[in-house]
Amino acid sequence: MSKRPPPDPVAVLRGHRHSVMDVSFHPSKSLLFTGSADGELRIWDTIQHRAVSSAWAHSRANGVLAVAASPWLGEDKIISQGRDGTVKCWDIEDGGLSRDPLLILETCAYHFCKFSLVKKPKNSLQEAESHSRGCDEQDGGDTCNVQIADDSERSEEDSGLLQDKDHAEGTTFVAVVGEQPTEVEIWDLNTGDKIIQLPQSSPDESPNASTKGRGMCMAVQLFCPPESQGFLHVLAGYEDGSILLWDIRNAKIPLTSVKFHSEPVLSLSVASSCDGGISGGADDKIVMYNLNHSTGSCTIRKEITLERPGVSGTSIRVDGKIAATAGWDHRIRVYNYRKGNALAILKYHRATCNAVSYSPDCELMASASEDATVALWKLYPPHKSL
């Protein structure tokens, strides 16, 4: 019996005039956010499959590099990143963007690395929704509070203020590549302040050996594993193919350094459980890895060799069952995340695929491409076993 052909998208969203760089679903509403290389940010209705809003979020010369929505950010906010050195936080008003951004982070970063909103562990969609209602509890007694570990040079007073503030409200952090392309910076989206940089060094110190010779940081993931007592962790992928795992309680030295790729790491995704993830790069490898926070290790769980090199984007569904990659060969590849086996190769797009993302209810997947389209897919419903 022959294999069934891969499905077609349930809808194709057209309207962007240039390459669609990133895509993100609203945490609870039937809305999709997309950003393109000419600076346009569009909001789409995923039920009626039409655009409900369009705005020029960043300059046309620099474009939108990334967009993100999150239950931790709030129901009425999204953030965008441009190659103009800024990250902007927007209010969603009647389905459209606020005329002016609520907050602008002047990161002075003009690179290709997409930002990462902090990912906090959740075992169910209800936990994410409870955050917007002010709930501080998660299963197992963990809290949504994210604490900042200050280095020895930060005063005790500043440290106390940070921790008190974080306990009082659900602070949301974002990680970006810094003005120095080997460094990762963490910013507070409530205050607009830069909190810390990795690796941490004083002005009179020489370049940190942990990132020396690795080239630019090309991919980053910011997350808060349940074992960390609320302290942030960062995965950073570099130009030489290496991946560094950081615990900000020790901002000078990474917990571990591994080299899963032979070419630049272009995308990192951490599962909602924060105990592993998937990476892709400019080589012909897709790597699924485990994170052990008690030992500070990152180890390969599954390595997949591609016929054609190049992975621009990766995503793991919230339920941890499915993962997908966006390829240079115009293909979206879908995998069983738990077992590591291939499930489908989707061939709709006619140019490089830049990003892929799953809806919070696990029903939809969206793919973005240089062909200026966004495709919506319904694959492997969450209530069915694989």
UniProtKB/Swiss-Prot annotation:
Disruption phenotype annotation: Defects in both embryo and seedling development, and pale yellow seeds. Die as embryos, probably because of intolerance to desiccation and abnormal protein and lipid body accumulation in mature seeds, but immature mutant seeds can be germinated in culture and lead to short life seedlings defective in shoot and root development, with reduced hypocotyls elongation in the dark. Seedlings accumulate less anthocyanin, are intolerant to desiccation, form trichomes on cotyledons, and have reduced accumulation of storage proteins and lipids.
The terms describing its cellular component in GO are: Cul4-RING E3 ubiquitin ligase complex; cytoplasm; nucleus
- Coiled coil ranges: none
Which compartments is it annotated to reside in? Cytoplasm; Nucleus
Q: Which domain of life is it from?
A: Eukaryota
Q: Which UniProt keywords apply?
A: Cell cycle, Cytoplasm, Developmental protein, DNA damage, Nucleus, Repeat, WD repeat
First and last residues of every WD repeat: 15-54, 62-100, 157-197, 213-256, 260-299, 306-347, 348-386
Which InterPro entries does the annotation name?
A: G-protein_beta_WD-40_rep, WD40/YVTN_repeat-like_dom_sf, WD40_repeat_dom_sf, WD40_rpt
What does the UniProt record say this protein does?
Answer: Involved in the formation of X-, Y-shaped and twinned plasmodesmata (PD), thus modelating PD size exclusion limit and regulating cell-to-cell transport. Cell cycle checkpoint regulator that monitors and responds to DNA damage such as DNA cross-links, and triggers the halt of the cell cycle progression in the presence of DNA cross-linking agents. Mediates the active process of aluminum- (Al) dependent root growth inhibition and thus is required for response to Al toxicity. Required for both early and late phases of embryo development as well as during seedling growth.
State the PANTHER family in the record.
Answer: GUANINE NUCLEOTIDE-BINDING PROTEIN SUBUNIT BETA-LIKE PROTEIN 1, TRANSDUCIN BETA-LIKE 3
The Swiss-Prot or TrEMBL record describes its family as follows: Belongs to the plant DSE1 protein family.
Q: Any extra remark in the record?
A: 'Tanmei' means short life in Japanese.
Name under which the protein is recorded = Protein DECREASED SIZE EXCLUSION LIMIT 1
Species lineage, top-down?
Eukaryota, Viridiplantae, Streptophyta, Embryophyta, Tracheophyta
